[in-house]
């Protein structure tokens, strides 16, 4: 979810025994999770005494790695697990671990080492490898995405209250003028799978269906621990018989709707710049209620309007929908939202964002939306050096985000001290 220093994309599971579903309730004698260091790490010295978390349904287990980054787990109940790990290192530690070959992008920022495997079947004794990546912590993160929408008191779908929120993790005011917000390609049948992107673009780009920009001609400072609220309709939606919606009149920016049947816009709220939309008739944020709502933040001095566009894979069409190819190196933060499935949960194979941008995904509980659910970052149990609240950012949205029907804009969980 941050600017990536280096990562190998493959997350592999090495199975050492056959699956035996007939004995699926008997605890396994031995399961091993092995951390695989990023290529620039000179050895495994930073992989010892790290916490591995295994989640399945309503149970969570943890294990500690040995000096070589290997965790042995006894008496593990056979199940389908999400396995993850993450820890922080300083920029000087990163330089030391890489023998000076890896240079952090900013000495002011710490870095996060992380890795994740989703829906890993463990029904027999085996060794599971988790490929690690390293990413630089960012000042500004995506902290809320409200795409689900709701229904009003007449049981009619109410879409107007969708919004995004950003949060400043740093102890300094940050001028976000000129910051870009990208909405990721979200077709029912993917325009490009990650495998397609690997084949044609060597994992170097992300497909965007829309690009917006915070106006660059006016200073726009976010206070330490402050938020930025970006909406489609900056009105008080609670007055429209929509009890699960919010008062958005205090929004910082509004994506103005210029369609023939527009949402109500607020002339008192500044316009978000629209740079590109895959449909000329859609000028506001096209957040899909079904959950295919990947969002990225990126920064560049390049002329974004000149960037290459592509038709769906294998890009042989001459007309139709086109997506902008965003160079991955400019991405500061990214959150993968996927549709939920009642029986299996989100389908990780539908990911649009590389694991080094977001190792997993977040999602609402509902499978179709219209429930007033918002995905939002958890509050960390740590404070900033200046004493303000921090949000969890481990480069893994499955770990970093919660879901709520009641939390309000600019509001986050409080952690007891």
Predicted segments, located by residue:
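Bacterial Sec-dependent N-terminal signal peptides
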Residues: 1-42, 130
């Amino acid at each position: 979810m941050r600017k990536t220093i280096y990562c190998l994309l493959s997350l592999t599971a090495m199975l050492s025994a056959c699956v035996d579903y007939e004995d699926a309730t008997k605890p396994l004698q031995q399961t091993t999770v092995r951390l695989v260091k990023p290529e620039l790490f000179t050895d495994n010295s930073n992989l010892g005494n790290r916490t591995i978390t295994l989640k399945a349904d309503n149970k969570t287990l943890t294990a500690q790695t040995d000096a070589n980054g290997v965790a042995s787990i006894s008496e593990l109940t056979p199940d389908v697990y999400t396995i993850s790990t993450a820890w922080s290192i300083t920029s000087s530690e990163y330089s030391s671990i890489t023998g000076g070959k890896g240079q952090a992008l900013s000495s002011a920022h710490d870095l996060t080492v992380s890795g994740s495997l989703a829906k890993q079947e463990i029904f027999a004794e085996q060794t599971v490898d988790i490929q690690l990546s390293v990413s630089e912590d960012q000042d500004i993160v995506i902290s809320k995405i409200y795409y689900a929408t709701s229904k009003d008191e007449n049981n009619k779908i109410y879409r107007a209250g969708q919004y995004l929120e950003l949060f400043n993790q740093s102890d300094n005011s940050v001028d976000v003028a000129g910051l870009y917000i990208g909405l990721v390609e979200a077709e029912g049948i993917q325009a490009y799978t990650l495998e397609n992107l690997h084949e044609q673009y060597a994992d170097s780009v992300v497909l965007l269906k829309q690009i917006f920009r915070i106006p660059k001609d006016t200073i726009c400072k976010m206070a330490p621990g402050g938020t930025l609220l970006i909406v489609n309709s900056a009105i008080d939606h609670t007055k429209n018989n929509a009890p699960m919606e919010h008062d958005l009149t205090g929004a910082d920016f509004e994506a103005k709707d210029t369609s023939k049947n527009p949402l109500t816009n607020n002339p008192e709220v500044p316009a978000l710049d629209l740079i590109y939309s895959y449909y000329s008739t859609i000028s506001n944020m096209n957040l899909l209620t079904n959950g295919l709502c990947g969002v990225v933040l990126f920064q560049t001095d390049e002329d974004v309007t000149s960037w290459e566009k592509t038709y769906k894979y294998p890009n042989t069409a001459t007309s139709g929908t086109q997506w902008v190819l965003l160079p991955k190196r400019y991405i500061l933060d990214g959150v993968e939202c996927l549709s939920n499935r009642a029986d299996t949960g989100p389908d990780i194979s539908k990911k649009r964002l590389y694991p080094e941008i977001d190792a997993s995904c977040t999602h609402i509980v509902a499978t179709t939306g219209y429930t007033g659910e918002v995905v939002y970052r958890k509050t960390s149990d740590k404070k900033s050096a200046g004493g303000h609240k921090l949000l969890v950012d481990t480069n893994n949205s499955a770990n970093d985000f919660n879901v709520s029907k009641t939390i309000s804009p600019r509001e986050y969980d409080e952690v007891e001290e």
